[in-house]
């Protein structure tokens, strides 16, 4: 059975985790995601902060930068994929790293999508809606 798109108005609340060390970039992502009705957003400054938040909550999607202090986004992807409780949560990499080998590496580690900065709200929304199987 193929999953069908769900109307945003008729689905249960969804929860996104935005992991970005730059407060300005994090706010741009939050602003873009705020256009998805009923999407609750939690923010994290880096991979370690994200893992703390993942330990106590359920998330439906994770958006993460790669280049962050303490724990980068690729290490976060590895850790999330190794955790049985979160291994199937879609992960979107949002980064300035635009080389094809960077994208391939992230996807090989388990990312579901790779979006390069500068952040374009329509592109972020398209990817999130596709991964969450929401109607546009």
Where are these regions (language model features)?
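C-terminal output helix
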Residues: 28, 119-129
């Amino acid at each position: 059975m193929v999953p069908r798109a769900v109307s945003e108005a008729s689905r249960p609340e969804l929860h996104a985790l935005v992991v970005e060390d730059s407060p300005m970039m994090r706010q741009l992502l939050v602003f873009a995601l705020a256009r998805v009705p009923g999407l609750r957003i939690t923010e994290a400054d880096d991979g370690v902060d994200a893992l703390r938040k993942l330990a106590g909550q359920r998330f439906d999607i994770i958006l993460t930068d790669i280049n962050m202090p303490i724990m980068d986004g690729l290490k976060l992807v590895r850790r999330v994929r190794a955790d049985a409780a979160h291994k199937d949560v879609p992960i979107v990499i949002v980064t300035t790293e635009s080389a094809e080998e960077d994208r391939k590496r992230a996807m090989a580690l388990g990312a579901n999508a790779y979006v390069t900065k500068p952040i374009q709200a329509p592109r972020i929304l398209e990817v999130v809606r596709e991964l969450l199987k929401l109607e546009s």
